[in-house]
Amino acid sequence: LSEKDKAEINAGVQHILSEIGFEQLPKFLESFIDNKTIIKKNNRFCFGLGLIDQCLKSFNNKILLHQQNKESYLELSKGNVYFGTGGAAPLILDYERKVYRPSLGKDLLNAARVVDGLDNLSFFSRPLVLTDISDPHLMDIYTAVISLSATNKHVMTSVANYKTVKSLAEVCYLIAGGEDAFRRSPFLSLNINFIIPPLRLDAEACEVMRESVKYGIPVMANVFGQRGASSPVSIVGSVCQT
């Protein structure tokens, strides 16, 4: 990107945040509407330029993703690139039978073990859905437990309900040897899809994000706008919305 492109993106982002805004503000944020930091315009919710500027100045451009052994970490900063897994596949190819079948807990365990032994993969973002557990709360907890038991590398997962976050945090505290130890070196983070393109907040996902911050679990905020469909067709416009 040229300096001109960067300036256009910055101006576009600030315009979207302060003038266009978002739909469906979560209830817990409604109390912050004060026409200064969070502003309501035509049933949409915008952010004040002062708040935007304050956030930009406070952002950390070096983030550490820790591992369980506390001896190594991933430094997310300029020039560093890492590869890992990802996705949420409900099916897996059964290599011996040459057919696809529902993914199970043992498959997630094996996938995490493989990643743990591969030097070219630096983190484990759960790639499979546990179809052998029907309860969403238990499925999210067991997904994390299985992943953490099979790899020392940083684990990324997700939860469907904000009430699950506390239970997940307690598991992490137990593994780390205490809450303070986990907060100092969090070896698990959550993928949260908090936006429904274009520019609608997902209330449930925002609740998950709030609980994650409360319990010291790092958050990776995912945005899935599609160029020309749920976001502008131009690269600059799509990046601005994202």
Where are these regions (language model features)?
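Acidic/polar, glycine-rich intrinsically disordered N-terminal extensions of enzymes
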Residues: L1-K106
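Helix-rich catalytic cores of soluble enzyme domains
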Residues: P102-T242
